[in-house]
Amino acid sequence: MTAQSATARSHLPLFLALLYGVAIAYASLQPFANWMAPPPGTPFFLFGPLAPRWTRFDVAINVIAYAPFGFFVALVPRIRPRARLVVALAAGTALSTALETAQMFLPSRDASTLDLLANTAGTTLGALLALAAARSARAARAVTVVRQRWFLPGTVGDLGVALLAIWLAVQVNPGIPLFATTFDTDLQLDPALASAPDDVAAIVVAGATSAFQLLGVGLFLALLLRERRYIGGAVLALIGSALFVKGVAAALLLKPAAWHHWLPPGVSDGVAAGALLLLGAIGLPRPVQVALAAIALLSSVLTPLLTPDVLFAHAPLSGFAWSYGQLLNFNGLTHAVLLAWPVAASAFLFALAGRPGWGEPS
């Protein structure tokens, strides 16, 4: 099977496009409250005036946000090469138009033609990048070899890889510590808060959450692999990628005084403990790994219930070197995905374990 034919049969781009589209919809419509009809006489947003106040930064964020969506749609299988750009552009425009229309019923949101244009431009940019990548035989072959050699075959493997990619992508929020699911309660630049004594309970809970998350995600990855001999390298690559994404995001998005907060002492201890637990768990039978992964993932969501200060912590906006309105969308989306991901991943693993003859890695 050639790289092109294998890529064409893969459902991974479709799953990524669907998951990313849901993420865009959530970010565009949250907090899903106070819906009301527009005042009488309000024109449809396409025929209304442009927003009186806008920044180049917000426009750039919209372009960047929709570029991955266009990229994934353009790579969806069974679309003729000549039609990929048109299909991606139509999908991005339709999604953006639907969401901007829905925003007309949310007083906290502003439906804007400028947003639609920026979103469409981002979709087009992503689709063009996908077409350029698809023309590179070397790049297509490299992706196909990794996908086929390392991970489970078929639709199940594609969906698992898509879920793993979504988890890695949301590590881009440095306001949420490494392998955590809630915001860092200490990431505030208020001197009064900075001088307060450390909450031991919050530190313990944060460490336990990170340990559970690392154990669960590591086992999730191990269960996606074809052969056990790939587990060590794959887990190290995953942890290294998460460290890289979180560290770069902290350097770019946080103020210098808050750079270290993405890896506080409690979390670093939890990551170390989770790594040791994972080392002992990768040799267990796969049915046991499924149960242990689900317990660990769900525990990473339930553990913050023990400390309301951690559970209801708000996004630490003062620690970000980013004062634009898109920051609320960014924090809300990444936080929601991190809370929902363990549930979705656990459901996927139980569905995988229920398939007849899913077998053991070689």
Question: Which residues are covered by each model-predicted region?
Answer:
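Bulky hydrophobic segments
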Residues: 1-108, 113, 124-362
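Long, hydrophobic, well-ordered secondary-structure blocks that form the structural core
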Residues: 117-120
